[in-house]
Curated annotation (Swiss-Prot):
It holds the Pfam family AdoHcyase. SMART domains: AdoHcyase (SM00996), AdoHcyase_NAD (SM00997). The keyword Cytoplasm applies. It catalyses: S-adenosyl-L-homocysteine + H2O = L-homocysteine + adenosine. One of its GO terms (molecular function) is adenosylhomocysteinase activity. Gene3D superfamilies: Adenosylhomocysteinase-like, NAD(P)-binding Rossmann-like Domain. GO terms for cellular component: cytosol. The gene is ahcY. Transmembrane segments: none annotated. It comes from the Bacteria. This is Adenosylhomocysteinase. It is found in: Cytoplasm.
Amino acid sequence: MTTTEQRLTVESRNGIDYKVADLSLAEFGRKEIRLAEHEMPGLMALRREYAEVAPLKGARISGSLHMTVQTAVLIETLVSLGAEVRWASCNIFSTQDHAAAAVVVGPHGTPEEPKGTPVFAWKGETLEEYWWAAEQMLTWPGEPANMILDDGGDATMLVLRGAQFEKAGVVPPAEDDDSAEYKVFLNLLRERFETDKTKWTKIAESVKGVTEETTTGVLRLYQFEAAGELPFPAINVNDSVTKSKFDNKYGTRHSLIDGINRGTDVLIGGKKVLICGYGDVGKGCAESLAGQGARVQVTEIDPINALQALMDGFDVVTVEQAIGSADIVITSTGNKDIITLDHMKAMKDKAILGNIGHFDNEIDMAALERSGATRINIKPQVDEWTFDDGHSIVLLSEGRLLNLGNATGHPSFVMSNSFSNQVIAQIELWTKNDEYDNAVYRLAKHLDEKVARIHVEALGGTLTKLTKEQAEYINVDVEGPYKPEHYRY
């Protein structure tokens, strides 16, 4: 038995595998799930539409996505459409423990006799625990997983790199400059290779497709495709308009300030704020903080995004120009080493630093941890790091997603958009698999519009209907789609 297995074991009750913080939290979680269902009209509409069809029957979906109340509604939607599901979180801090417990127990079970879905997630996992949970999510009794639902690409990477190393006959040793997380990742694969030399290959051969939620994970998929390493089709859910223009912007606009407020309780009005990146997420960040009265500056590499920021009223600067005067610094780029150790040393005393991109490498956490700076934990996911000159910075969620680490993430309504796309994408790949090559695709425009229509109606909006003559004049169908693929919303 390996070191990891000695400390971490799968629990099982009433035939349900799980590893969560506390099953007794299930009643609290179920109450919040019921409220969330009311705010997630897209998912509830899909349940009604496909209730008699069960289009996902036979699908064994391994899901790696933040284990929140909203995700619980997604999981139970997949199950209601016929799928079997196993789940883990895609972030060590993002799990809401009452939601995880409620999913395991299920709507008709009890903590003593759960009747729900296997979940392996709890808030505050170590890196070793995180990757152990990811493996459990992908480890099915009997036949392997045949679908992946991913957020950030960790589940996909675990399967593909595991299969790649099995083919090579060896898991490579970690390099000195590899991140702590990558070392844990390699160690898990090495331990598993010692006991099962074909595990990941079998899973890779079984999987029919993957649907990916985030910008970071989509980038990984395109890299796998370009290298000829993608063994199954993938749908890029992130770039569905009803995901990227809503979750990324409006969700962030809500949850960023929630995380900052819960983590620090500082007044945002009047503060100097630096937002690194002005994509959809960065736009939501800037808008939310400016709305609180902050004085916002933006960094950008792309002149188009930079021009948008200027036209929206924000100065465009470099990190080096603004880091010394900023009271709050937020990274939202999807890239690495945006805030380096030198940048952190140059920040004001007690300045706040946080990330709302997917991974913790936007802020060079490895360099900070090696620097000799002392760390004092103020409260969960809030740390004060003091440098040798005596000044300190306040770091949120250890450089990981502060909106999920310090708060509860995006609200239910906006996640209904994103998760409706996930469900539709899973149905698409599962039921029409032979129509897709091993490449990365986007959902069709009419499906994007379908998701939007449901939510317009839920908010009480009334859509104008084209006449036949008007539709012919602009060369579209009366029922849509109304825009070409190249249209920029």
